Amino acid sequence: MANFTPVNGSSANQSVRLVTTAHNHLETVEMVFIATVTGSLSLVTVVGNILVMLSIKVNRQLQTVNNYFLFSLACADLIIGAFSMNLYTLYIIKGYWPLGAVVCDLWLALDYVVSNASVMNLLIISFDRYFCVTKPLTYPARRTTKMAGLMIAAAWVLSFVLWAPAILFWQFVVGKRTVPDNQCFIQFLSNPAVTFGTAIAAFYLPVVIMTVLYIHISLASRSRVHKHRPEGPKEKKAKTLAFLKSPLMKPSIKKPPPGGASREELRNGKLEEAPPPALPPPPRPVADKDTSNESSSGSATQNTKERPPTELSTTEAATTPALPAPTLQPRTLNPASKWSKIQIVTKQTGSECVTAIEIVPATPAGMRPAANVARKFASIARNQVRKKRQMAARERKVTRTIFAILLAFILTWTPYNVMVLVNTFCQSCIPERVWSIGYWLCYVNSTINPACYALCNATFKKTFRHLLLCQYRNIGTAR
């Protein structure tokens, strides 16, 4: 993260060139003010990042691969808020390092490992989003929770390997410790040029990479959002006309027999299907009811024509008495049903009586199935468009969050790293307090990150509110 400088100025860690003489110690009022401000920032940082971690833990809506990377970043920010901020504040207020060499090295190792892990997590987030928008067909299949865990572990392990051994054991490698007891800085960073080299690798190069990636992410996201944006009236009209001109599907429904009826007979208490007649007689209006013993029928509408029932084959029953031919009123079924009319016809031939049920389609053959198919296709198309728009909205939300995080990182880390660049060429050009403020701004980035999540993601914001108000039952429904 940052680099510390001893009082004599020979080191590159100019941010901690603290005054060690009594007459340069901070006044009491100034120390109280600094302690209050930095203590408040530390508390806000700790609480904010704990809220982030709890939100991801308890709300399943936030348990995504991208948010697991944010969880890792929140862990790093929590460590900075709990330890690094307070130890550096103690160093500033006291004017010297009062905790000894061992605590100094442990603090520096922790500070640099965690800060470097933050940068690595930001790089992972940027690359992850870049591959999501540029390779939407292949990358999501490999974007699993296991892969995210491996990437997060790699970021922390690499940061530890790069900084912790060098900070803790450099004095044993060279055979002596050159850092004074009342100061705290990294021993092997004793040259401003070396410090500048580490700043290039730890800040400038990652910033360039993340900026380029974000530009590509933004362009790709805008392209996808533009593709799925709502259509204008003219576009909708043109597409509707084209849809009406091109038939969706040719109905492959067999033409019904003349009269448009299928027949079923009620015989011996059972409803059985009877074959349609081979040669139907001429139609007859329903209004002319037949009162003879040949047949009697009912119809659902006055203008619907029907044919007389054909003689149905049945078992011989000489002893069966002839039954009167009842005339039943037709029933109209549910309009949404496939059939809408029922005709009950009774025929008496000789000594047996046969009752048949005719079910007549309400619409011409093929019209209702074709309409159903069209409605199904339209429903599927609407669902697909809605899902694509929801996906585009989620992408915009994630892109906004990444932009806010990267912007906060660049704004808070740039002042210190610019001072490192200037100090390489002019070691006396930057006042000591400016160094301290610049170094503290790097810590403030850990305070800002939780606010970025809440401002750019409504689900985070609602979950934060439920946690703070102890409304635990509403956490799972926060969206």
UniProtKB/Swiss-Prot annotation:
Protein family (similarity comment): Belongs to the G-protein coupled receptor 1 family. Muscarinic acetylcholine receptor subfamily. CHRM4 sub-subfamily.
Composition bias type Polar residues, residue spans: 293-303
Disulfide bonds: 104-184
Extracellular side: 1-30, 89-105, 171-192, 423-436
Biased composition annotated in UniProt, kind: Pro residues: 274-285
Subcellular location: Cell membrane; Postsynaptic cell membrane
PROSITE patterns referenced in this protein's UniProt entry, alphabetically: G_PROTEIN_RECEP_F1_1, G_PROTEIN_RECEP_F1_2
Keyword annotations of the record: Cell membrane, Disulfide bond, G-protein coupled receptor, Glycoprotein, Membrane, Phosphoprotein, Postsynaptic cell membrane, Receptor, Synapse, Transducer, Transmembrane, Transmembrane helix
Primary localisation category: membrane
Protein name: Muscarinic acetylcholine receptor M4
Positions of the UniProt region annotated as Disordered: 271-334
A GO BP annotation: regulation of locomotion
Glycosylation sites: 8, 13
Function of the molecule: The muscarinic acetylcholine receptor mediates various cellular responses, including inhibition of adenylate cyclase, breakdown of phosphoinositides and modulation of potassium channels through the action of G proteins. Primary transducing effect is inhibition of adenylate cyclase.
Topological domains, Cytoplasmic: 54-67, 128-147, 216-401, 457-479
GO CC aspect terms: membrane; postsynaptic membrane
Lineage: Eukaryota, Metazoa, Chordata, Craniata, Vertebrata
Membrane-spanning intervals of the chain: 31-53, 68-88, 106-127, 148-170, 193-215, 402-422, 437-456
Species per Swiss-Prot/TrEMBL record: Mus musculus (Mouse)
A single MF term (Gene Ontology): G protein-coupled acetylcholine receptor activity
